[in-house]
């Protein structure tokens, strides 16, 4: 993002995302996922749109992910055949960041911990089949991050990314992120047994 301090506008972000043929958007709050899904679906005329959250029962979530994978395969096949694919958009909470094998050409991630952003980036051109590199966009949502560790991780990422580094996933930055995160994290060792 141009600034790690300036929140986006949901409507403008939805317009931008809806302009892509295929995009995965990941946010940290269920309410954000529902709102952004509603806005994208209203703008993405003719597109297939899905919403994923941990509130879905496991079978429904699995069925939806299988449907998304099938749509992604059809999307890639249409592009390979020189045809116009049916646009598709997924808005999800962070449940897709680990253990869910999705491969999108464009991924949007709400500002979060560096580890979460890296996991989200792993859903972009995951299989390396795109003719050009995929694109990962980080945005600052207009809502507050959930309290606790998620806020601490987001704030630590903001501190490490000050000045918007050329390579946001450079190993020295990742090392610094985890050192700061674990140093600043509230301890569960109330009796100081580990000291």
Where are these regions (language model features)?
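Glycine-rich phosphate-binding "P-loop"
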Residues: 1-8
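Short, flexible, glycine/charge-rich loop motifs used to bind or transfer phosphoryl groups or to couple energy/partner
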Residues: 13-15, 79-81, 97-98
């Amino acid at each position: 993002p141009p600034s790690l301090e300036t929140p986006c506008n949901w409507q403008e972000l939805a317009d931008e995302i809806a302009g892509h043929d295929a995009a995965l958007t990941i946010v940290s709050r269920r309410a954000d996922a529902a709102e952004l899904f509603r806005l994208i679906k209203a703008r993405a005329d003719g597109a297939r749109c899905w919403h994923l959250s941990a509130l879905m029962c496991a079978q429904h979530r699995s069925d939806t992910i299988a449907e998304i994978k099938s749509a992604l395969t059809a999307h890639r096949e249409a592009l390979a055949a020189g045809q116009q694919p049916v646009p598709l958009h997924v808005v999800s909470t962070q449940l897709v960041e680990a253990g869910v094998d999705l491969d999108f050409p464009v991924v949007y991630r709400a500002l979060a911990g560096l580890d979460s952003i890296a996991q989200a980036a792993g859903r972009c051109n995951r299989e390396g089949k795109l003719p050009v590199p995929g694109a990962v966009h980080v945005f600052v949502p207009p809502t507050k991050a959930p309290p606790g560790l998620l806020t601490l991780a987001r704030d630590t990422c903001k501190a490490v990314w000050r000045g918007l580094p050329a390579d946001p996933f450079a190993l020295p930055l990742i090392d610094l992120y985890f050192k700061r995160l674990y140093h600043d994290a509230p301890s569960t060792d109330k009796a100081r047994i580990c000291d």
